[in-house]
Amino acid sequence: VTENANPVIRSEPESDAAAESLERLDRVLDAAGELLVRWGYRRVTIEDVADRAGIGKGTVYLHFPTKEALFLTVLLRGYRSVVGGIVERMRADPLEVLPGRMTRSLFVALLADPVARPIYFGDTELLGRLAKEATNTLGPLRERGQELNRSHFQLLRDAGLLRTDRTLAEQHYLLQAVGAGFWFLEGFELPSAPADPAARAELQEYALVAALEPADRPEPTVELAEVVARLYESLIDVIDEEWRRRVR
C-alpha cells in the first residue's frame, strides 16, 4: 500500500493521452496517500493534493468529484495490494489459510504500512466518511468479498480445519468481531496492550485459534492453500473492474 506499490491499473495498448492520464492519476493518488500520513484526513484538501502532485485543482476534480471519492480510491488501490499480499502468503505457507494466522499476518502488514495504518487503524473520521461513500459505490465488491470469505470457511470446515459446533455464519461473524475489536483498539493507548505490534497480532491469532480451530486440527495442505489463494486472487479481478468503473 506504500507509494507507487499499486500503480494505476492499465490495459494495453494505450494512446499517449491515455498513458499521460494514468500517470497523472498515479501522482494524484500517491500525493493523497502522502498527505494523509502527514496531516490526517481532516486537514487535507483537494488543493493540497493538487499542489503535491504538481497539477491544477480542476484536474483533480476531473477524476474525483469529491474528497471522499478521492480517498476511497486511495483505499481501493491499497486494498488491491492487501489482497495480493494475502494470496502471496498463502502460496508461501499453507498455514496462512487459517483465519487466525491470516488475520495475524494482515494485522502486522497493515501496521507496517505508513499509508494503510491511518486508514485502517487510526483515522476514525476517514473511516466513517469512506464507509458512507463505499455503501453507495462499492456494493458488488463488498458482496463478492463476503461470498469469498464464506467459501473460504466452507473449504476449511470440509478439510477438518475449523470446528463445526457453530454455523459457518456464526464463525464468520466471530472472525469479523474479533478482528474489528483488535483494529479498533489500535486507536487507544491501553496500558494492558503489549508494546510490540507482533505480540498484539499474536494475541489476535490466539483468540481466533481458540474460538475456531479444533484441538486435533490437521495441517493444511499445499493443494488446499492453492485453492483458497485462487479464491482471493479472483477478488483482484473484481477490484480491477471497480477501478475501471469509477476512475475517469
Name each region found by the language model:
Residues 1-18, 34, 43-45, 53, ...:
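Short glycine/proline-centered loop/turn elements that form peptide/ligand docking sites
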Residues 1-8, 147, 151-159, 184-248:
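C-terminal peripheral helix-coil segments that are non-catalytic and often amphipathic
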Residues 21-32, 49, 74-82, 86, ...:
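Generic hydrophobic, amphipathic alpha-helix propensity
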Residues 31-35, 109, 178:
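Short amphipathic alpha-helical elements of helix-turn-helix/winged-helix folds
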Residues 83, 130-161, 166-184:
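Amphipathic alpha-helical packing segments from all-alpha helical-bundle domains
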